[in-house]
Amino acid sequence: MKISVHAVGRMKAGPERELADRYFERFAKSGPAVGLEFAGITEIAEGRSQSAIERQRDEGSRLQAQLQPGTALILLDERGKSLSSQDLANRIGQLRDGGRKVLVLAIGGADGHDPPLRDQADLVLSFGALTWPHQLVRVMLGEQLYRVATILSGHPYHRA
């Protein structure tokens, strides 16, 4: 299954980007052994409207335009469900084993995801009730994808 990350906004060069890149590279190397191929990161321009609702709609339509029919979609959103790393690995494994060919994990803009997009997602995932900076969400997502690959392969990186 090809896995890509779609993120509203651009991540500037710096230590956060380097750390995120390091985890995504680890995932890219370890994922193929368990049928997960990292297809990269797509950055989506932030909405420019004065209204938060309009920005959500604009960003949501740009994200929607990037999705192929049949794409599995996991949205990262503070209103989502908190899962353990093992549960996330199980969910991604189920999508893979269920025949899904493409999975997009999407990081929304500052206003969150458009409600209709949340409604169509296979999973709305939260990294907890706290609000996280976009840069750290990318780092945490990269680490969790790497962890998912290690869990699915039985690698000792994840020692739960």
Swiss-Prot record:
Gene Ontology CC entries for this record: cytoplasm
Entry EC number(s): 2.1.1.177
Coiled-coil residue spans: none
Residues at which S-adenosyl-L-methionine binds: 76, 108, 127-132
Major location (coarse): cytoplasm
UniProt KW keywords: Cytoplasm, Methyltransferase, rRNA processing, S-adenosyl-L-methionine, Transferase
Subcellular locations according to the entry: Cytoplasm
Pfam families reported in the protein's UniProt record: SPOUT_MTase
CDD domains to which the protein is assigned, alphabetical: RlmH-like
Reaction(s) catalysed by this chain's protein: pseudouridine(1915) in 23S rRNA + S-adenosyl-L-methionine = N(3)-methylpseudouridine(1915) in 23S rRNA + S-adenosyl-L-homocysteine + H(+)
Cysteines joined through disulfide linkages: none
Role of this protein: Specifically methylates the pseudouridine at position 1915 (m3Psi1915) in 23S rRNA.
Subunit relationships: Homodimer.
Family, similarity comment: Belongs to the RNA methyltransferase RlmH family.
Protein name (record): Ribosomal RNA large subunit methyltransferase H
Lineage, opening ranks: Bacteria, Pseudomonadati, Pseudomonadota, Alphaproteobacteria, Hyphomicrobiales
